[in-house]
Amino acid sequence: MRILVEIAYQGNNFLGFQIQQNGRTVQQQFEKLLQRMHKRHVRIHPSSRTDRGVHAIQQYFHFDTELNIPMSQWQYAMNRTLPDDIYVNNVVTVDDDFHCRYDCVGKRYRYKVYQAQHRDPFQSGLKTFIPETLDLDKMNRAAQQFIGTHDFTGFCSQKTEVESKVRTLYQSEIVKTDDGFDYIVTGSGFLYNMVRVLVAFLIEVGKGRHEISDVPKLLESKNRKNVPFTATAEGLYLEKIYLDENELLKDFGNDIKIHRKKSLQND
């Protein structure tokens, strides 16, 4: 039987989602819990592998089990054992051919920034602090330029190993908040550090160091050296996972390009 688990976690005290040799990770917490229940190792498969310090409002993983436990009891058993910075929101059964990673057709990230004269220790780890005044309208107009299908070679880590760096963004916008702004971006998928590089670039636009007209040129150049900065993980949230094409079409229209990840080799 294949089980789908929806979770949320606060990423400050994790080295990321994926198992690490030395260090606390989200995957480690769940596989340790499931091993105790099954008396054997149980591998979990996530929809996304968040990095160190990145939070998740909605994340999924699946695993296979032979245990005959009601769904409500799965949720109760997990939450009773898990630490306070992880929570299981829902547990359901899925078809045996369902795969959390390859059936994912879209993801939304939110990057939170607060602006003030001084750093607020109570925001530490939850939002990124930027003291400078930024042109948010200009940043938003630059952000809109990324909507569509592009090769994001110049806007991801040079450590990115996947062959195709073409991704489709359905949403890319700066939203003003009471104490700063959020960058919200929804796409078919994201390359390693892609969201953080986009944020860093948009902040440079807000400071007047880049123009809106630079976006097409930088996409065309495919040169990471032209966009050298990466925003910190602090303030980055995996906000939503789309496992249903119809939900994605409902949110962004029937004309969008859907990337079916069962034909891709990247998360």
Swiss-Prot record:
A Pfam match: PseudoU_synth_1
Enzyme class: isomerase
InterPro entries per record: PsdUridine_synth_cat_dom_sf, PsdUridine_synth_TruA, PsdUridine_synth_TruA_a/b_dom, PsdUridine_synth_TruA_C, TruA/RsuA/RluB/E/F_N
GO BP annotations, alphabetical order: tRNA pseudouridine synthesis
Catalysed conversion reaction: uridine(38/39/40) in tRNA = pseudouridine(38/39/40) in tRNA
Superkingdom, natural source: Bacteria
Keyword Disulfide bond carried by entry: no
GO molecular function: RNA binding; tRNA pseudouridine(38-40) synthase activity
Keywords linked to the UniProt accession: Isomerase, tRNA processing
Active site annotation, chain numbering: D51
EC number(s) recorded for this UniProt protein: 5.4.99.12
Assembly and interaction partners: Homodimer.
PANTHER family, per database record: PSEUDOURIDYLATE SYNTHASE, TRNA PSEUDOURIDINE SYNTHASE-LIKE 1
Family matches, as NCBIfam families: hisT_truA (TIGR00071)
Stated family: Belongs to the tRNA pseudouridine synthase TruA family.
Record function comment: Formation of pseudouridine at positions 38, 39 and 40 in the anticodon stem and loop of transfer RNAs.
Name recorded for this polypeptide: tRNA pseudouridine synthase A
Lineage: Bacteria, Bacillati, Bacillota, Bacilli, Bacillales
Gene, per the UniProt record: truA
